Amino acid sequence: AELFPGILKATRFGYDGKGQAVVDSLEEAKQAFKELGEVECILEAKLPLAYEISVILARNHQEDIVVYPVGVNNHINGILSSTTVYSDLVPKDLVHEAQEHAKKLASGLNYFGVMCVEFFVLDESKLQSAQPRLVANEIAPRPHNSGHYTINATACSQFEQQVRVMAGMPLGDTSLLVPTIMLNILGD
């Protein structure tokens, strides 16, 4: 398998584009390794990315799971810029597949609370026949910035959902009330 182009990522404390570097050669990988502080890293293949989606779910102690509408994420310089959510944005079969993977992951980890699983959706025109079209990119065992849209756009926000799980209350309604675009504004 080709090593380059790839993304060199620190195995700990990397997020929002931090702790990673795109590398096109062994020389660039060595330089990036130095710039990352020579900490433990992994080299990921650069995938034919079409877009990224977030699946946000909540799982309670009775093992019930609710899933929020899937959002499509846009990044600028490796940092989430916006999440767009409306009913026909992502093909329904892809939504179902991603949600099922996320639910199996939460159940397999015996996780309780709100969790986000980000998936890369790969460009099918560039895939080889045996390659999956979804690749899990990030698992966040907490309310996630791509789910901040739930504050105003769903019946029950991801934050209220977390409280419901911890308090032993029934899970809330995740229905989308309005089509939404969430802008991620960061402070220093």
Predicted segments with their positions:
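A structural signal for short, well-ordered beta-strand segments
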Residues: 55-57, 70, 117-119, 139, ...
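Intrinsically disordered, low-complexity coil segments
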Residues: 2-3, 89-92, 122-133
